[in-house]
Amino acid sequence: LRAVLRMLPEDGEVTVAELIPAVVRWNRDPALGLGADCLADPRVTIVEGDVVECLEAGAGRFDGVILDVDNGTSALTARGNDRLYRATGVGLVRRALGPGGIAAYWSAHHDPAFVELLEGSGFEVTVERVRPHAKARGGSHHVLFLAHAVASGSRR
């Protein structure tokens, strides 16, 4: 969120959907040093609820959608999260994006089948392996699926 806010214009808006109210409380607590300053930014709206509901209500509204749900596309720990990584969920994200929008999916692992699903749903996809944070050395990497919405019948 902090990185998004750094790049966002003053008249921009960010909607954060968080299913677990305790996560919002933790992030609002300045003593924990997690993100209270970000959540207090007037450009940020917090929705305590399911991201699916935000996406359904936002058809064509978003320039970008960032999904960091569970462990990603296949290493799921919570039932029901898989719906975001199936055709219906990817279609929902696609419809929520405005022209030229981009969706970023965080995952613990690379998933070629998910890339195929995204491409078949009207996205051009780039896969990036990134470190958990800027100062991380060695160890694990995360995977970002960057899905650029393309107009029907065209490719970037």
PLM feature spans:
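C-terminal lobe and adjacent flexible extensions of AdoMet/dcAdoMet transferase-like proteins
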Residues: 145-156
